């Protein structure tokens, strides 16, 4: 029997090392037949550009992280060329170990006190008008990192008064009330928390998370800030059924959520959860129609849609696929 990995603080555990720490054992992609990508999933990635290099340089200069890079998002080049980025605060090491995600797991170091000011200045230098702020899970912090989110919102607005801020938050497991209280005076313009998948698949896909808890987080925030839109996203292709997704959409609407993203799951490596199915574009279109019929005001649904993909256009209600 192999010895458990002794995690060192500040060390990133990825791929096989990360998967070995998950209490629920999943069959990695390397042990299953890898599905061939259909034609609609084959895109030509844009070449590097000065805009991409400038954004990466600004991140490195200020010791900031983007979820675009840390999670190996397939839309990185497109978004960076568009002049948008999703900043990941509170470090690049997550206390969770979800087998679909490429963000590193481990014991994170203490939050950087100057990060909110650095983030605000970087956004000012980049002349952004809409920004998405997300974070790793920080179960080691008493408020899950909520005060750090609030501090970032405050500092960003101080230097960028015309900006719109979307926050994509973790579930603040076990500390929801404390987290919501920390953010009450500095809420975002859009509050986003992803359910990710159907409740039947939570044990496999989101070990340590709870479906109802996530719904309650969205509802409680909406109750506190009725004028701030709430948003959530789901991945397709993890073994869910269409009927299960429709039920999740109904649950989201029952908890006040009006903005939705649906996209195709792609395995970051052979060590992650395998893709069970590639969902055809027509099915995404059908789910979008269902979402709008259920009362969602915004629904971005398509194979390459991600939670923060063209978030500025989503917030304006423009078509995003």
Swiss-Prot record:
Membrane-spanning intervals of the chain: none
Major localisation: cytoplasm
One GO location term (cellular component): cytoplasm
Annotated residues for binding of [4Fe-4S] cluster 2: 94, 98, 101
Residues annotated for [4Fe-4S] cluster 1 binding in this entry: 68, 73, 79, 308
Pathway in which the depicted protein is active: Protein modification; protein lipoylation via endogenous pathway; protein N(6)-(lipoyl)lysine from octanoyl-[acyl-carrier-protein]: step 2/2
EC id: 2.8.1.8
InterPro entries cross-referenced by the UniProt entry: Aldolase_TIM, Elp3/MiaA/NifB-like_rSAM, LIAS_N, Lipoyl_synth, rSAM
Gene3D superfamilies: Aldolase class I
Compartment(s): Cytoplasm
NCBIfam families the UniProt entry points to: lipA, PRK05481.1, PRK12928.1
Protein name in the entry: Lipoyl synthase
């Amino acid at each position: 029997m192999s010895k458990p990995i002794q995690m060192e603080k500040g060390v990133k555990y990825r791929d096989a090392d990360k998967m070995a720490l998950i209490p629920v054992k999943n069959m990695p992609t390397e042990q299953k037949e890898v599905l061939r990508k259909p034609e609609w999933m084959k895109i030509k990635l844009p070449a590097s550009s000065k805009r991409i290099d400038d954004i990466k340089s600004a991140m490195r200069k200020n010791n900031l992280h983007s979820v675009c890079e840390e999670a190996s998002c397939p839309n990185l080049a497109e978004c960076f060329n568009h002049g948008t980025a999703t900043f990941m605060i509170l470090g690049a090491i997550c206390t969770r170990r979800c087998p679909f995600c490429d963000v590193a797991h481990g014991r994170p170091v203490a939050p950087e006190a100057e990060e909110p000011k650095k983030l605000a200045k970087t956004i000012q230098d980049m002349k952004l008008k809409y920004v998405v702020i997300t974070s790793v899970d920080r179960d080691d912090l008493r408020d899950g990192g909520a005060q750090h989110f609030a501090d970032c919102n405050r500092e960003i607005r101080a230097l960028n008064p015309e900006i719109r801020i979307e926050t994509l938050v973790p579930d603040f497991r076990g500390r929801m009330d404390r987290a919501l209280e920390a953010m009450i005076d500095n809420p975002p313009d859009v509050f986003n928390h992803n359910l990710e998948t159907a409740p039947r698949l939570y044990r496999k896909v989101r070990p340590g998370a709870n479906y109802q808890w996530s719904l309650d987080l969205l509802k409680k925030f909406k109750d506190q800030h009725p004028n701030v839109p709430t948003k959530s996203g789901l991945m397709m292709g993890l073994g869910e059924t269409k009927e299960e997704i429709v039920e999740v959409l109904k649950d989201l609407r029952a908890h006040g959520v009006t903005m939705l993203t649906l996209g195709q799951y792609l395995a970051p490596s052979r060590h992650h959860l395998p893709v069970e199915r590639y969902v055809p574009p027509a099915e995404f279109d059908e789910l979008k129609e269902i979402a709008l019929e259920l009362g969602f005001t915004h629904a971005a649904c398509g194979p390459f849609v991600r939670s923060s993909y063209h978030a500025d256009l989503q917030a304006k209600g423009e078509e995003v696929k």
